[in-house]
Amino acid sequence: MEVKIEESWKEILKAEFCKGYFKRLVNFIKNEYKTKKGKIFPPPKLIFNAFDSLPFKDIKVVILGQDPYHGKRQANGLAFSVNSDIKIPPSLQNIFKEIERSLKIQTIPNGDLTRWATQGVFLLNSILTVEESRPSSHKDIGWEIFTNEVIKIISKNLNNIVFMLWGNFARGKKELIDASRHLILETSHPSPYSAHNGFLGSNHFSQALRYLKEHNKSPIDFQ
């Protein structure tokens, strides 16, 4: 299985890659891609796209998702993001709607969030792979152990990071983050089922930009 990951992450996570659970996870995932050709998302080379798109030291904002989109050609390894030629999913539509409302800007009608990642937004799903049409199909195979460790490493080794936790699943990660050195923003999930329960009107993006400015970090263009 081809895995692409940025060099600084390779160094930071090398101990994790050597652990027994991770080796078992890799073997499981390799077998899934081999036996279910074209049915596991994202493509192998994009599994670690969130890491490959952003060096560790350049992280400014962390947005946590659950697992990748499970439709064909949707998932591109970045939480909430889809390939540029794919229709924008409802949750991402609501994210754009909140950005436009709170920042008074016009978002680009393109669901590929690589443009955010390259500016310092770490778009991390807790589970990094999924089987077609089976949401959460790769739950409890080891990904959560790995990504929980990633969150703890960010919290421990960086300062003044904005963590956006949307929905009960993401909010459950709050205990992994040191609130004394980072900004934790919590609200409902941007899904159409819950966006009106807090997400729309949360002002998370304006709060994030204000926090970055207060800590002398360059702003992010959320268009």
UniProtKB/Swiss-Prot annotation:
Subcellular location(s) per record: Cytoplasm
Reactions that this protein is recorded to catalyse: Hydrolyzes single-stranded DNA or mismatched double-stranded DNA and polynucleotides, releasing free uracil
Keywords annotated in UniProt: Cytoplasm, DNA damage, DNA repair, Hydrolase
Record GO biological process: base-excision repair, AP site formation via deaminated base removal
SMART domains according to UniProt: UDG, UreE_C
Major localization listed first in the record, in broad terms: cytoplasm
Cellular component, GO, one term: cytoplasm
Active site: residue positions: D67
EC assignment: 3.2.2.27
Coiled coil: none
GO molecular function, one term: uracil DNA N-glycosylase activity
InterPro entries assigned: UDG_fam1, Ura-DNA_Glyclase_AS, Uracil-DNA_glycosylase-like, Uracil-DNA_glycosylase-like_sf
PROSITE patterns: U_DNA_GLYCOSYLASE
Function: Excises uracil residues from the DNA which can arise as a result of misincorporation of dUMP residues by DNA polymerase or due to deamination of cytosine.
Family listed: Belongs to the uracil-DNA glycosylase (UDG) superfamily. UNG family.
UniProt protein name: Uracil-DNA glycosylase
Organism expressing this protein natively: Borrelia hermsii (strain HS1 / DAH)
